[in-house]
Curated annotation (Swiss-Prot):
Belongs to the TRAFAC class myosin-kinesin ATPase superfamily. Kinesin family. It comes from Schizosaccharomyces pombe (strain 972 / ATCC 24843). SUPFAM superfamilies: P-loop containing nucleoside triphosphate hydrolases. One of its GO terms (molecular function) is microtubule binding. Residues 446-473 form a coiled coil. The gene is klp3. This is Kinesin-like protein 3. GO terms for biological process: cytoskeleton-dependent intracellular transport; establishment or maintenance of cell polarity; exocytosis; intracellular protein transport; microtubule-based movement; retrograde transport, vesicle recycling within Golgi; transport along microtubule. Residues 3-325 form the Kinesin motor domain. PANTHER family: CHROMOSOME-ASSOCIATED KINESIN KIF4A-RELATED. SMART domains: KISc (SM00129). InterPro entries: Kinesin-like_fam, Kinesin_motor_CS, Kinesin_motor_dom, Kinesin_motor_dom_sf, P-loop_NTPase.
């Protein structure tokens, strides 16, 4: 589990604040600590990073955001949220100024970085990149890339997770295409002028990008989704001078942000068991970003001036609470069956070296170390292992450390099991012998099922041929009856009726058998699928993620 990364960005004073003649209330003490001094409060807040007013867009990107792109290519989901009061610099941080490279925001910089990495990738990797763009305005979801953009709804299922039904998705092949789409969507976003901000965003905007990469040699597929969120700013109606429609917008914005705050409170307070994700569209869409499968960065944007001291303190407290959220990010990866088998063999071989090293370090009787570490075709003896690898104590310790690190996220249960057995070879042999026996039994059942399926298909073919023959004979007899006017001959009519009755009975019996065969066939196909799935899952780690390679990274 990883915590949400929270960075604090303090913007320079703006013209309004300078005209009011206020003073600074917030001061960076170092790269991670900020001090705030107001008439009601004095204290420090610690974040992952604090950026002072002179920090550039590139400073923010290099420290806070670039690693999110790298994680995306490893198969992780990522989220970047900009939070703060109206006019605090959220949209500038996320979008920047168009056609100004130095002042480009985090979103266009990430798009450039993504396609740079694609260009630098091996030729054996294929990519698909698709984007979508939406806003949440007055608690309604609008598609910023489609004219028919109203009344989109949020749905959730086990396969896709949370998604917006009907949201337009566009495939892109370059940063130019992606930036054009981004700028088009930005032009459709709801804004209004207030006393606090001449271009105040009246909606939450969410730019979604998905990268799917496939290794054409191994068949492995990884996918990562990136949510780039520019939240509407909380605002004091008294300061912003909001009236009419702008006032109604402010109410909806504040209510939505209040729900976001309650979600964060619930995630960080062990006494609160219910997390109110469903209380707003924003929190439903960001469910995985807050406490779920995502590596999330929150950028809190602050005004330094005393005029906004209350709002700045509220923002700092929001960021401080968010730091306590634990996300459960996992690699979204699918390996081919051959690759899973290969990695399982590598894992077993490396783990056996750890077993050998532990025995040698514990001064066990070397002459008695001839028992198999693994049963079956992968069996190794400790004596052979020691001879072949010529392990020294330092190498053993380093090998042990490598195994621990390589399996840190994905095989914790297996490593814990080994520790519980104190590298007891009998226990390990028994566990793997049982696993291999079960696999052999499943293979036998699968072979038997395939044979039964083949027999059923043959029987079904024979039954179909018999049915065609019966229908053909029935038609011939019917034609003879009509052509010869045999209805006037009572004896023949009775005989024909008996034949028809027999044919109908046989036809009904056939249909009943056909129905039974169909049901049996469907059941067997279902069993076959379950067995294949069980065989594959038997070679996967229990937590459902992919085993890391012992040599050569993931």
């Amino acid at each position: 589990m990883t915590s949400i990364k929270v960075v604090c960005r303090i913007r320079p004073t703006n013209q309004l604040e300078q005209d009011l003649g206020g003073n600074n209330v917030i001061y960076p003490l170092n790269d991670s600590t900020v001090h705030i001094e107001t008439s009601d409060y004095s204290g420090n807040f610690v974040f992952d990073r604090v950026f002072h007013p002179s920090s550039t867009q590139n400073d923010i990107f290099s420290y806070s955001i670039e690693s999110t792109v790298d994680d995306l290519f490893l198969g992780y989901n990522g989220t970047v949220l900009a939070y703060g009061q109206t006019g605090s610099g959220k949209t500038y941080t996320m979008m920047g100024i168009e056609n100004n490279f130095e002042k480009e925001g985090m979103t266009p910089r990430m798009l450039r970085r993504i396609f740079d990495k694609i260009r630098d990738s091996p030729s054996t990797t294929e990519y698909e990149v698709k984007v979508s763009y939406m806003e949440i305005y007055m608690e309604k979801i609008h598609d910023l890339l489609s004219e028919k953009n109203d009344r989109l709804t949020v749905h959730e299922d086990k396969l896709q997770g949370v998604y917006v039904q009907g949201l337009k998705t566009i495939y892109v092949s370059s940063e130019t295409e992606a930036l054009d789409i981004l700028n088009k969507g930005m032009g459709s976003r709801a804004v209004a002028s207030t006393s606090m901000n001449a271009q105040s965003s009246r909606s939450h905007s969410i730019f979604v990008l998905e990268v799917v990469q496939t290794d054409t040699e191994s068949g492995e597929t990884r996918r990562g989704r990136l949510f780039l969120v520019d939240l509407a700013g909380s605002e004091s109606v008294g300061k912003s001078g909001a009236v009419g429609q702008t006032l109604e917008e402010a109410k909806k914005i504040n209510r939505s942000l209040s729900t976001l705050g309650m979600v964060i409170n619930s995630l960080t307070d062990s006494k609160l068991s219910h997390v109110p994700y469903r209380d707003s569209k924003l929190t439903r869409i960001l469910k995985e970003s807050l406490g779920g499968n995502s590596r999330t960065t929150l950028i809190i944007n602050c005004s330094p001036d005393s005029y906004n001291a209350t709002e700045t303190l509220s923002t700092l407290r929001f960021g401080h609470r968010a730091k306590s959220i634990k996300n459960k990010a996992v690699v979204n990866s699918e390996l081919s069956v051959d690759e899973m088998k290969r990695q399982l063999y590598i894992y077993k071989d490396a783990l056996s070296r750890c077993v050998c090293g532990a025995r040698i370090n514990n001064n066990l009787d070397y002459n008695n170390c001839h028992s198999n570490v693994w049963s079956g075709e992968h069996s190794l003896t400790l004596s052979n292992l020691a001879e072949k690898s010529n392990l020294k104590e330092a190498e053993i310790i380093q090998g042990n450390r490598t195994i621990q690190e390589s399996n840190n996220d994905r095989d914790e249960s297996t490593v814990a099991s080994i520790h519980r057995h104190n590298f007891d070879s009998d226990s390990i042999n028994r566990l793997y012998a049982e696993a291999q026996l079960e696999l052999k039994q499943r293979d036998g059942v699968l072979s038997s099922t395939k044979q039964q399926l083949s027999d059923l298909m043959t029987a079904l073919g024979d039954a179909q041929e018999r049915y065609v023959e019966l229908v053909k004979n029935h038609r011939v007899n019917s034609n003879l009856t009509a052509n010869n006017s045999l209805n006037d001959k009572p004896g023949f009519t009775i005989e024909q009726k008996d034949k028809n009755f027999s044919i109908n009975n046989e036809r009904n019996n056939f249909l009943q058998k056909l129905s039974t065969l169909d049901s049996s066939l469907a059941a067997l196909v279902n069993v076959q699928r379950k067995l294949i799935k069980a065989l594959i899952s038997k070679e996967r780690p229990q937590n459902g993620t992919v085993i890391k390679k012992i040599q050569g990274g993931t």
